[in-house]
Amino acid sequence: MPLTCMTVLTREGTSELMRHRDVALILATGGSEMVHAAYSSGTPAIGVGPGNTPAFIERTADVPTAVRRIIESKTFDYSTICASEQSVVADAPVERAVREEFVRQGGRFLNPDEAARVASVIFNAAGKMNARLVGRSPQMIGEAAGVEVGPEARVLLADQSGVGRKFPFSQEKLCPVLAFYTEDGWENACERCLELLNYEGAGHTLRDRKSVV
């Protein structure tokens, strides 16, 4: 174990480490409290906020490749990093092809009842991610929710028609679960992507609205 690695983690120990004279810069991720503590430590700090990254699959896209890359990203460390995709926005003309390709590559679409069950276990009453299911497999999430998930499933997908508290999968999910949207045309898809970014993660990957158009 390197000498620079803390083997016992406590709030007090983390606070002392951030204020230590030999620490030149803090890269803080893990939530707003952690970022606030880093900014208040007196040491130069860079804070990382939640990422709510959407992936738009446009009608001329190579669908198998797009789906493969999304799944590879979402299943890396079971989506414990905030840079992984959180939502898929499919262009209407290729929606069916996208759905079929996800299933072919290990996607498991949840029906409305299953989606409600999964939402109830991966989020708490305040709408925050349940820490016990961060970075857990689709099978473990399914077991916790009382939803049968086969061994072939690599990611879970839930259809959503909007963004906000009434649509729980529209926020960051640090586990292999994706929201699925369908929009007709890149303009509508762009608006949906902006809506997702503005709901949670605004400024994380996008600062200038004009830059995407």
Please describe what each predicted stretch is:
Residues P2-G13:
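Glycine-rich oxoanion-binding loops at beta->alpha junctions
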Residues V35-G164, A189-C193:
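ALDH superfamily catalytic-core signature
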Residues E16-L25, N198-H204:
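Short, surface-exposed connector motifs at secondary-structure boundaries
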Residues V147-V213:
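Conserved C-terminal structural/oligomerization subdomain of aldehyde/semialdehyde dehydrogenase
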Residues E12-S15, M34:
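Short acidic active-site motifs
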Residues I26-A38:
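Glycine-rich phosphate-binding loop
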